Structures are given as C-alpha cells and as structure tokens.
Amino acid sequence: KEGYPDGQNGKKIPCAINDNISKTXEQA
C-alpha cells in the first residue's frame, strides 16, 4: 500500500495516506 498506479492520472499516488484511499489506492 505504499503507492499504486492511479488509472485516472497514470501516476503513482500514496494509498496509505487515508484509510479510505488505502482500500482502492485511488485518489478521489
């Protein structure tokens, strides 16, 4: 959960920032 590729922007974002984000790894 360090960071997964975000399909929306095609760049890696930290998934562990928020408990909600860590589940999908996507930025809202």
From Swiss-Prot:
Region of interest (Disordered), residue spans: 1-28
GO cellular component, one term: extracellular region
Keywords: Secreted, Toxin
Tissue spec: Expressed by the venom gland.
Function: Causes symptoms of mild intoxication and transient paralysis in insects (A.domestica).
Annotated compartments: Secreted
Species lineage: Eukaryota, Metazoa, Ecdysozoa, Arthropoda, Chelicerata
Biased composition (Polar residues): 19-28
Paired cysteines (S-S): none
MF terms in GO: toxin activity
Main localization category: secreted
Name of this protein: Venom protein
